[in-house]
């Protein structure tokens, strides 16, 4: 997974990992999967993002037929506090990587599950 930093005008930097499968590079209309990690992976450390869940599986060789983006929640915060940042980030990632905005899925574990629920509300 590639290491990237998204810069937001109000929230500052958001570290994230991205995986674009070969079949979706330089093409538009791909599905996109957004993975939110748990509370133990907050901060500004790419290795923490890849510790559990989908980024770990991709690094171990799992093929996911979608663009996968995995943002990192800033330290001392929870995803529930960052719904507006997540919304902006997802819009940015969809445009940046050519995802179909009708084919975006959001998932998470632990604190990331709560963030997923909050985004759905």
Where would I find each of the regions flagged by the language model?
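A domain-start/cap signature at the N-terminus of enzymes
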Residues: 1-32, 66, 107-114
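Active-site phosphate/pyrophosphate- and oxyanion-stabilizing loops and adjacent acidic/basic residues
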Residues: 56, 91, 117
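Active-site machinery of serine-nucleophile hydrolases
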Residues: 32, 36-85
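Gly/Ser-rich "nucleophile elbow"/oxyanion-hole loop immediately N-terminal to the catalytic nucleophile
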Residues: 23-28, 74-110
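Structural motif
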Residues: 25, 60-61, 96, 121
